[in-house]
């Protein structure tokens, strides 16, 4: 039996400047990342050169939970809680579009290149659909009585996974927005949904601290349940090469897993890896340098280097 390779991981930088908890992260072009926080600041960083100061791109009145980079338009879309969607033209460093939404929190944003549509999960259980590039509100669809917390696209199957605080994950048809499947094994709020790079699996996680793996081809049959953290799992993210899965939690830790087997490889916490001291809220794998970036309630971002 071959020995499991557990890649060494070290914290190589701290990105500081936010004045409150950092909730949102998204990758941009190359090694660029963007962060958003409870202080309403949206900041751009270079994960390849973490010694460089961040660049303030926007400051809005309320908190920011969701960010999405649109490469074809070179725009950064932010969810301005209780206000709506804003799109920043990154070339001109200016606001290009602003679309009002119901006055609730905006928890996640995804973009379908094939449909030219932006989807936003709202705090009142509504899915907002906007057309791109004009960012016109096309539809508001009430899916649940509780918050829609996370979204993931499967472009190949034309499906949208929606995790919510009613403990359900709904799989919608991207065109009709009708529910194809409902996944009900979670025992509490679903905070993260992510498809594997090859599109064969959907992973879900949330307040019950377990990672569940679903087989897409068999109609989302449950294939594995892993007790992964002590407390709420806030986010899951696959590495660009598909080899690793990272999870982060209210328990202040980041965990690195073998993506194929969900075997635990590393725990990145305060004691073992100079990790965050409070809840870790979101993760992103920028660029191609085997780097992982996390953000936390401690107002900072951490840059982690994998030696693979």
Where are these regions (language model features)?
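Residue-level detector of Asp-centered blade-edge/turn motifs that repeat once per structural unit
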Residues: 28-30, 71-72, 113-114, 155-156, ...
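WD40/WD-repeat beta-propeller blade N-cap
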Residues: 15-22, 57-64, 99-106, 141-148, ...
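WD40-repeat beta-propellers
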Residues: 42-46, 86-88, 127-130, 169-172, ...
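Short loop/turn segments that connect beta-strands within beta-propeller blades
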Residues: 47-50, 89-93, 131-135, 174-177, ...
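Blade-level signature of beta-propeller repeat domains, shared across WD40, Kelch, NHL, RCC1
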Residues: 279-308
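Conserved strand-to-loop turn within each blade of WD40 beta-propeller repeats
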Residues: 36-39, 79-82, 121-124, 163-166, ...
